[in-house]
Amino acid sequence: ASGGIGEPLSLLLKQSPLISQLALYDIAHVKGVAADLSHIETQAHVTAHLGPGELAECLTGANVVIIPAGLPRKPGMTRDDLFNTNASIVAELIDSCAKNCPKAMICIITNPVNSTVPIAAEILKRHNVYDPKRLFGVTTLD
């Protein structure tokens, strides 16, 4: 929630009248983002969850999970390099989603989306909670 996509996305979600609870998760800096967002007067209550030890608490009872996690593609980095790093991040997050919020709508922004979404689907299938109407890849062409 504290990266280049997660932070502005958190701001937009905080401002939405459809959001009552906004649970932010990251491996660094998330408490500062949550503190900044808490100063915005909306109905959404913001909580911060830092590191793998707080992931289950963050996801428990979630209706919607948005995953912008991972490294951005850097100059000289191949899509294979990007995949090797980001696939394991998505796999860990989806595994926790399957256990803690199996009925949540899951939106994956992590690149390469055409590879991370199928990985997520397979993990959800392994946990017997896969619903193709609840898993989305969110992307744009650049």
UniProtKB/Swiss-Prot annotation:
Q: Which GO terms describe its biological process?
A: tricarboxylic acid cycle
Q: Which reaction(s) does the protein catalyse, per the Swiss-Prot or TrEMBL entry?
A: (S)-malate + NAD(+) = oxaloacetate + NADH + H(+)
Q: Which residues bind substrate?
A: R73, R79, N111
A GO molecular-function descriptor:
L-malate dehydrogenase (NAD+) activity
Name the residues that bind NAD(+).
Answer: A1, S2, G3, G4, I5, G6, D26, N86, I109, T110, N111
Protein location: Mitochondrion matrix
E.C. numbers: 1.1.1.37
For whether the record's keyword set contains Nucleotide-binding, the answer is: no
Major localization class: mitochondrion
- One annotated Gene Ontology cellular component of this protein: mitochondrial matrix
- Report the superkingdom from the record: Eukaryota
Q: Which UniProt keywords apply?
A: Mitochondrion, NAD, Oxidoreductase, Tricarboxylic acid cycle
Q: Which family does it belong to?
A: Belongs to the LDH/MDH superfamily. MDH type 1 family.
Q: How does it assemble?
A: Homodimer.
Please state what the protein is called: Malate dehydrogenase, mitochondrial
Native species of this protein? Schistosoma mansoni
